[in-house]
Curated annotation (Swiss-Prot):
InterPro entries: PRibTrfase_dom, PRTase-like, PyrR, PyrR_bifunctional
Source organism: Limosilactobacillus reuteri subsp. reuteri (strain JCM 1112) (Lactobacillus reuteri)
GO biological process: DNA-templated transcription termination
Name by which UniProt lists this protein: Bifunctional protein PyrR
Primary role: Regulates transcriptional attenuation of the pyrimidine nucleotide (pyr) operon by binding in a uridine-dependent manner to specific sites on pyr mRNA. This disrupts an antiterminator hairpin in the RNA and favors formation of a downstream transcription terminator, leading to a reduced expression of downstream genes.
Length: 178
C-alpha cells in the first residue's frame, strides 16, 4: 500500500521554492535552459520555467532528454547492432549555457550520470546544475542535487512514485514498501 508523502499543493510549494533558489543562486536567470529527463522530469522542468516566467518575466527554454541509450544498467538482449545516439534530440543549443537538469526522483544517480553523458554529446554547457523534486538517498555514484524539493529517507526495498497531472492525471508523491 502506498503512503502519500506530498500532495499536489505540497509539490507546487516545493517547485516554487526550487524556483526561488535557482534565481538566488544564479543571481538572476540569464543564460539558463531547463532540460527535463523523460518522462516526469520534462513536466517538472516546464513548471519551473513557467514559475520563473511569472517571477522574472523571462522565457526560459525547456527541452526533453531521453537518456535510455546512455544507461549503464539496462541491457539490450541483441548485441549485434549498436544503438544510434541522436545528438540532435535537444531542440535548443546548450553550448555556453547554464543547464538546469530536472528529474523527479534522485536515487542511485545512474539516470543523472546517463543524462550528463547525453548532454556532453550535445554541446558544451558552461555549467550543469541538478534539480530534483525528491532525493531519496542510496547513491551509487558521487552525484548530489543542487536544488531539492524534499529529502525522503527510504529503505532499499521501497519505491517512490511521483505523479504529475499532465501525465498521470493526478498529483502526488507516494512511497510504497515492496
Amino acid at each position: 500500500m502506498a503512503h502519500e508523502i506530498l500532495d499536489g499543493s505540497s509539490m507546487q510549494r516545493a517547485l516554487t521554492r526550487i524556483t526561488y533558489e535557482i534565481i538566488e543562486q544564479n543571481k538572476g536567470v540569464d543564460n539558463l535552459v531547463f532540460v527535463g529527463i523523460k518522462t516526469r522530469g520534462v513536466y517538472l522542468a516546464k513548471r519551473l520555467a513557467k514559475r520563473l516566467n511569472q517571477l522574472e518575466n523571462v522565457e526560459i527554454p525547456v527541452a526533453p532528454l531521453d537518456v535510455s541509450l546512455y544507461r549503464d544498467d539496462r541491457h539490450v538482449p541483441d548485441h549485434t547492432q549498436e544503438p544510434t545516439v541522436k545528438t540532435d534530440q535537444l531542440d535548443i543549443d546548450i553550448t555556453n549555457k547554464h543547464v538546469i537538469l530536472v528529474d523527479d526522483v534522485l536515487f542511485t544517480g545512474r539516470t543523472v550520470r546517463a543524462a550528463l553523458d547525453a548532454l556532453m554529446d550535445m554541446g558544451r554547457p558552461t555549467r550543469i546544475s541538478l534539480a530534483v523534486l525528491v532525493d531519496r538517498g542510496h547513491r551509487e555514484l558521487p552525484i548530489r542535487p543542487d536544488f531539492v524539493g524534499k529529502n525522503i529517507p527510504t529503505a532499499m526495498n521501497e519505491t517512490v512514485h511521483v505523479a504529475v497531472e499532465e501525465y498521470d492525471g493526478h498529483e502526488d508523491v507516494t512511497i510504497e514498501h515492496n
